[in-house]
């Protein structure tokens, strides 16, 4: 069986390559999954931007100098050498931008398993966990695309809100969110607006102001040029989804009472830069698995997941509520389509209302008989 891998140059994200590789025979205890479809958003660009810093490149090895960007989606077991996983099983999880992947399931339960590959053991467990769709509490039949697009983003959003609340928002009551039209930003805003006394300010481009205002999750929406509409002495926290160096400099310079700078993402991939020498607090990169691990230690895994899933059900219904859903889903199949959407999202383009679902395979037959 020949597999396709979508590769990205680690030091030049605009350079990509499609490589065909021959799938090796399975050894005992492994399974081969056909990756049916996956979402691609600015969150995945952030994985690539922080690929070395936060070890995102380490999950799925690639040839020297190249990386395989992790994505979230659904796959089907098409070949199994593991006694507890049958062909045809539908699995949610963290995959490479490929047609197939081989995993080494361990700690297999009714709910799912962890990939026990040696190279993944030092990495955060939350990314190594795979769920059987048939019993997954997040999963709703017919909502797979919404789940793939928003589930990992909402988990990050929930944990950002939880982390800041856990820190009493560092004494701030004004929360500045960049790239306010991004899905992770507005998921975070939905959670933050439930906190009493918080001024949740969405910052976006002029073209996206109307969209952000239509969401109803921000106290107010401003363009990047309108920072002067927020009091310079406001006790504030900057929650950065853009990674724009000029914007960060402007915020640190204007807000003398900036309490915390929380870097979550990098939707403005071409406008990154150094934060050295800025006034105010040091930039703190938010790593969702670290907050998840803290809460699992305090509440247990079931306690954490129960809280997130309950809020997820409310959020996903809100996003898809007629007659004006926040999200329109587009399907894209084949290498050329994947390359086009990758380039568009990397450049920060596209309609914020649109969510992209991708399949690298040219046809279902390329994935195997059991794939959907």
Regions found by a protein language model. Give the residues of each.
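A short N-terminal beta-strand-loop micro-motif at the entrance of redox/enzyme domains
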Residues: 9-37, 42
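N-terminal Rossmann-fold NAD(P) dinucleotide-binding loop
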Residues: 185-186
């Amino acid at each position: 069986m020949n597999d396709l891998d979508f590769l990205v140059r680690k030091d030049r994200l605009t350079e990509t390559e499609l490589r065909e590789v021959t799938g090796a025979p399975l050894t005992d205890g492994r399974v081969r999954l056909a990756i049916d479809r996956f979402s691609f958003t600015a969150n995945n660009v952030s994985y690539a931007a922080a690929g070395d810093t936060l070890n995102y490149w380490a999950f799925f090895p690639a040839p020297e100098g190249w990386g395989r960007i992790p994505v979230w989606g659904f796959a089907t077991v098409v070949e199994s050498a593991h006694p507890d996983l049958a062909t045809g099983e539908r699995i949610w999880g963290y995959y490479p931008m490929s047609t197939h992947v081989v995993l080494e399931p361990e700690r297999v339960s009714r709910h799912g398993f962890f990939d026990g590959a040696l190279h993944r053991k030092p990495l955060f467990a939350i990314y190594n966990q795979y769920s059987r769709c048939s019993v997954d509490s997040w999963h709703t039949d017919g909502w797979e695309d919404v789940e793939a697009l928003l589930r990992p983003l909402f988990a990050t959003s929930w944990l950002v809100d939880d982390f800041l609340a856990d820190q009493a928002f560092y004494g701030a009551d004004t929360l500045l969110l960049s790239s306010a039209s991004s899905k992770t930003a507005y998921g975070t805003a939905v959670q933050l607006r439930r906190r009493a006394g918080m001024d949740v300010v969405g910052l976006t481009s002029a073209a996206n102001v109307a969209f952000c205002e239509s969401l109803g999750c921000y106290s107010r929406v401003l363009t990047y040029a309108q920072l002067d509409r927020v009091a310079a002495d406001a006790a504030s926290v900057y929650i950065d989804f853009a990674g724009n160096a000029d914007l960060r400099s402007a915020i640190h310079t204007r807000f003398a009472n900036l309490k915390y700078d929380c870097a979550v993402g990098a939707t403005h991939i071409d406008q990154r830069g150094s934060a050295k020498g800025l006034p105010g607090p040091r930039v703190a990169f938010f790593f969702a698995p670290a907050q998840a691990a803290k809460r699992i230690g305090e509440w247990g895994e079931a306690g954490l997941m129960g809280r997130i899933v309950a809020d997820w059900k409310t959020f996903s219904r809100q996003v898809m509520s007629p007659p004006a859903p926040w999200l329109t889903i587009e399907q894209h199949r084949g290498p050329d389509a994947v390359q086009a959407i990758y380039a568009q999202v990397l450049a920060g383009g596209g309609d914020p209302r649109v969510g992209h679902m991708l399949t690298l395979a040219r046809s279902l037959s390329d994935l195997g008989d059991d794939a959907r």
